[in-house]
Amino acid sequence: MSSKKKKTDAEAAQVQAAVEVSPDLDVEELEGVGKVTGAKLKEKGFYTVKDVAFASVKELAEIIGNEERALQIIESARKMLGLHSFISALEVYERRKKIRRISTGVRSLDELLGGGIETRAVTEVVGEFGSGKTQLCHQLAVMVQLPEERGGLGAKAIYIDTENTFRPERIMQMARARGLDPDQALNNIFYARAYSSDHQMILVEHAKSIVKQHNVALIVVDSVIAHFRSEFPGRENLAERQQKLNKHVADLLRLADAYDVAVVITNQVMAQPDVFFGNPLRPAGGNILAHGATYRLWLRKSKENIRIVKIFDSPYHPEGEVSFRITEEGLID
């Protein structure tokens, strides 16, 4: 057997061994992580090999106090899970076929999205006040609970509310309309009110343990930008705000990818005073949110209870828009 063939076989065996390692293996099983370090990591939300593999060196270094050691631990976790190995585009395609989707409850919007809101992705919903962003979030928190044959995932939701707009009464209306027990529907939603940007980010860290312990398939942050805009006003604070927002969005994306959950964030709009033709509004958050979100939807009001939603940024969807109505039962075609 040639040395090249031996090397190829060895690499294949290494990849196969990595695949067979459970990503939920306790973090203390990692090389270089004992009980003391393991306890420190768990206190900050790093419970498993997978948690560490998706972390940054800076994050772990702040916990264990040594950057070089943090790098070694992360490299060990990634090697254990085979994250250093290249795979074929065909394998990527096969993996994407396993992506789960949550129906929005609006057939035309599901078709526009290719089946609904994807797991392992961050979907951003942009719009003015009263455009229906929160209504859509409420409906998704109900829809995710439905069985798969009805467009759901038979799962629970986490709802982080930054503007005090969550209404359990609305959840109950939507649940009844879809044949769910209203009290049980509420019981399947883990709710938290975020009172500052720091609190909001801490809640996302805590969400990780809830996702691990419960059957959670949806995380909603409504709205992602509100506290950041109010706490960092003016150009002099813009760089600090964007740096902090960048970490927050990165944490959400890692959470979505690591635990196969759908993340939906809502975003506000801001006016461009120098625009005289076309739409003078643009999403808040700048390039951080533009690059951080996987899919971007724009909601706007039409006449009476009709709303129009447009997909304006996606890795593979064509641009398009559909309309829906907001009724007592929820969002419908």
Curated annotation (Swiss-Prot):
Q: Which residues cross the membrane?
A: none
Tell me which residues bind ATP. 127-134
List UniProt keywords, sorted A-Z: ATP-binding, DNA damage, DNA recombination, DNA-binding, Nucleotide-binding
Recorded GO molecular functions are: ATP binding; ATP hydrolysis activity; ATP-dependent DNA damage sensor activity; damaged DNA binding
Q: Where is the signal peptide?
A: none
Pfam families, per this entry? HHH_5 (PF14520), Rad51 (PF08423)
Matching entries from InterPro entries are given as: AAA+_ATPase (IPR003593), DNA_recomb/repair_Rad51_C (IPR013632), DNA_recomb/repair_RadA (IPR011938), DNA_recomb/repair_RecA-like (IPR016467), DNA_repair_Rad51/TF_NusA_a-hlx (IPR010995), P-loop_NTPase (IPR027417), RecA_ATP-bd (IPR020588), RecA_monomer-monomer_interface (IPR020587)
Q: Name one GO biological process term.
A: DNA recombination
Origin, by domain of life? Archaea
Which family would the database say this protein is a member of? Belongs to the eukaryotic RecA-like protein family.
HAMAP family membership: RadA_arch (MF_00348)
Query: What does it do?
Result: Involved in DNA repair and in homologous recombination. Binds and assemble on single-stranded DNA to form a nucleoprotein filament. Hydrolyzes ATP in a ssDNA-dependent manner and promotes DNA strand exchange between homologous DNA molecules.
Q: What's the protein name?
A: DNA repair and recombination protein RadA
Source organism per UniProt:
Pyrobaculum arsenaticum (strain DSM 13514 / JCM 11321 / PZ6)
Chain's gene name = radA
